[in-house]
From Swiss-Prot:
Heme binds at C461. This is Cytochrome P450 52E2. Belongs to the cytochrome P450 family. InterPro entries: Cyt_P450, Cyt_P450_CS, Cyt_P450_E_CYP52_ascomycetes, Cyt_P450_E_CYP52_fungi, Cyt_P450_E_grp-II, Cyt_P450_sf. Together with an NADPH cytochrome P450 the enzyme system catalyzes the terminal hydroxylation as the first step in the assimilation of alkanes and fatty acids. The chain crosses the membrane at residues 10-30, 44-64. It holds the Pfam family p450. It comes from Candida apicola (Yeast). Keywords: Heme, Iron, Membrane, Metal-binding, Monooxygenase, Oxidoreductase, Transmembrane, Transmembrane helix. Gene3D superfamilies: Cytochrome P450. It is found in: Membrane.
Length: 519
């Protein structure tokens, strides 16, 4: 059958009209009556004709130009409300930066939501782990992993000290220009692999990084593993952003990278299963994967959970350190205050390492970290899907004070990045880097669900204390060694305190953190 251009155009017009009519029929004749019965009212609806396709194009363009978080910021400014319907590619999403609605989704009505498409999008690399599973699978994962993140396990600083000192001595002390962001990723994968496997990738030491581990297809070096993990996460981020179309995003390189990661970790898994720890052996040295073999002998379960924890243990801490280093270089008066507090509390470079408790008690240090996490939360944008009919407590109706009906199957996104910079919550200087805001009375600040840099509710990050401990101790060592941090591209911060950021897993500075550490 031959179809000419005019016929194709007519068919396209009919299809478009059908989709537009379907969306209108659903909203006005199905959604709205059901919402009214429950005493709910819809939030504002924002369409970009036709079918939200123009907004989809703008969103994709912003993502590729490392401007996605600012695109969402401007979008909520256009909404004029903290919760709204947004039409994207024919689908109605609910978007929210309202703390009470986020609290409801993540805590109060936690059982009414799942991760939706995220499981399938991330399965290729991460498998059945705590960050991909929902429901009973997630509960089992959390029960398995929670004991591994007790204070005793995350507060040992000696192994961190070795890698931090290697980074400082080999890469920072010469006064050369470095990309601190790259080195922080090396640092955190070295410390995370030592915590997880008992052996480090040693990417900060080129000689050790080239030592290979035997695998089914030959040697895999720590350096190769780190590169493969980074490469796999790049495409994983694209798959997550593609939403329901995740299956269209794949490349042979992605699957090769996943295979390298799996082979590398399988070496440690089978080694731990084959050589169970005898009583008293290395009793003072905690190794995550070895402890996990006491709970399960399934190698796939151990590998998947280890990969999930590695994702959190490497990238979130590296992002926190990268953004913090940038701000300390761009705001020398803040660095001077921090350095003075560190020397007063912990002494100079040759002093004994601080304890976990001492790090938490250094108020200036913790204020700096809190402020960076406010401006750059670890997961700035997140998604959920309703698995039962449920409601949000506020945001509906003409005044935004009525409940909102959230039907089963409804997709929701919440923008932590936008919420934690919102002037209505944090005041007129909400986009400014001002660590001393945390000295103000708590009631004068946002409280509770206004600030969730590690997410919240039952799915709050298990490795939160590990990340904060490593970041805190790294900053202490930098302050002990260097009088000044010189950032070589301070102009990337605009009047809105916006840095070009790559929205990946997690977000990072798109231009790196080009830095010189001055002794």
């Amino acid at each position: 059958m031959n179809i000419n251009f005019s016929d194709a155009l007519m068919l396209g017009g009919i299809s478009l009209s059908f989709l537009l009519a379907s969306q209108a029929i659903y909203f006005y004749f199905i959604y709205s009556p059901r919402a009214k019965k429950l005493g709910c009212a819809p939030p504002p609806i924002f369409f970009s004709f036709p079918l939200g396709i123009p907004d989809l194009i703008r969103l994709v363009n912003a993502w590729f130009h490392d401007d996605l978080l600012e695109w969402f910021t401007h979008r909520f400014e256009e909404f004029g409300r903290r919760t709204a319907f947004q039409s994207v590619a024919g689908q109605l999403w609910i978007g929210t930066i309202e703390p009470e609605n986020i609290k409801t989704m993540l805590a109060t009505s936690f059982k009414d939501y799942s991760l939706g498409f995220r499981y399938n999008a991330m399965y290729g690399l991460l498998g059945n782990g705590i960050f991909t599973l929902s429901g009973d699978g997630w509960k089992n994962s959390r029960a398995l992993l929670r004991p591994q993140f007790s204070r005793e396990q995350v507060s040992h600083l000696e192994s961190m000290r070795t890698h931090i000192n290697m980074m400082i001595n080999n890469h920072f002390k010469g006064g050369q220009v470095v990309d601190a962001q790259v080195l922080y990723h090396n640092l955190t994968i070295d410390t995370a692999t030592e915590f997880l496997f008992g052996e480090s990738t040693n990417t900060l030491d080129p000689a050790l990084a080239q030592q290979g581990l035997p695998g089914p297809k030959g040697l895999v070096t720590g350096e190769q593993f780190a590169e493969a993990f980074t490469s796999a996460l790049e495409l994983l981020s694209v798959r997550v952003m593609a939403g329901a179309a995740w299956f269209l995003v794949w490349t042979p390189k992605f699957w090769r990278s996943c295979k390298v990661c799996h082979n590398f970790i399988d070496y440690f898994v089978y080694k731990a299963l084959a050589t169970p720890m005898e009583k008293g052996q290395d009793a003072d040295r905690y190794v995550f994967i070895r402890e996990l073999t006491k709970e399960t002998s399934d190698p796939r379960v151990i590998r998947d959970q280890a990969l999930n924890i590695l994702l959190a243990g490497r990238d979130t801490t590296a992002a926190l350190l990268s953004f913090t280093t940038y701000y300390l270089g761009a705001y020398p008066e803040v660095y001077d205050e921090l350095r003075e507090a560190v020397i007063a509390d912990f002494g100079s470079a040759d002093a004994e390492p601080p304890t976990f408790e001492q790090l938490k008690q250094c108020k200036v240090l913790q204020n700096v970290i809190r402020e960076v996490l406010r401006l750059h939360p670890n997961v700035p944008l997140n998604f959920r899907e309703a698995i039962a009919d449920t409601t949000f407590p506020t945001g509906g109706g003409p005044n935004g004070d009525q409940p909102i009906f959230v039907p089963k199957g409804q997709k929701v996104f919440y923008a932590t990045y936008v919420m934690q910079r919102n002037a209505g919550i944090w005041g007129p200087d909400s986009t400014s880097f001002r660590p001393d805001r945390w000295n103000e009375p708590r009631e004068a600040l946002a409280s509770g669900w206004d600030y969730i840099p590690f997410n919240g509710g039952p799915r709050i990050c298990l490795g939160q204390q590990f990340a904060l401990t490593e970041a805190s101790y790294t900053l202490v060592r930098i302050c002990q060694e260097f009088s000044r941090i010189e950032v070589l591209h301070p102009d990337v911060i605009t009047a809105r305190n916006v840095m070009k950021q790559r929205m990946r897993l997690p977000n990072s500075s798109s231009g790196g953190v080009i830095t010189r550490f001055i002794r």
